[in-house]
């Protein structure tokens, strides 16, 4: 799938709000309000991604929005828990040394000495830094199933090669 066709989930709808078709919004973006900067929104309706425009939004114990054409509570309730997505090319371009998490999934992780640790299976945030969850190779000499590797640039993460789909780390394979 090309970047132009790729769909990225940026949030989801919560419960309906009020009687005029407003919905609560759960944003997955770093700055929650920035979800409204992405246009148009794509919402999966009966297995197909359909474009929607936000008519209005506001903060009210979180975020709520009104979609164009959605005017009654009962109709809004059918959108509860549906994902909000945008086309990948709607996301801002990053500099060469910045990455979206989605770009790192599936990349091979190797030590600076060439030992293959596995592939990036997940990433999560901690208070101080992100952590790569690396699913170990089946024949891992150290018997590991997964490794948690802190995403600390230059100290642990030595190189990220987008073309080769490879991350080089300064990490002890036994840990």
UniProtKB/Swiss-Prot annotation:
UniProt keyword rRNA processing, yes or no: yes
Compartments, record wording: Cytoplasm
GO cellular component, one term: ribosome
GO molecular function list: ribosome binding
Database matches in InterPro entries: PRC-brl_dom, PRC_barrel-like_sf, RimM, RimM_N, RimM_N_sf, Transl_B-barrel_sf
Keywords for the protein's UniProt record, in alphabetical order: Chaperone, Cytoplasm, Ribosome biogenesis, rRNA processing
Subunit structure, interactors included: Binds ribosomal protein uS19.
UniProt protein name: Ribosome maturation factor RimM
Species per Swiss-Prot/TrEMBL record: Aliivibrio fischeri (strain ATCC 700601 / ES114) (Vibrio fischeri)
Gene: rimM
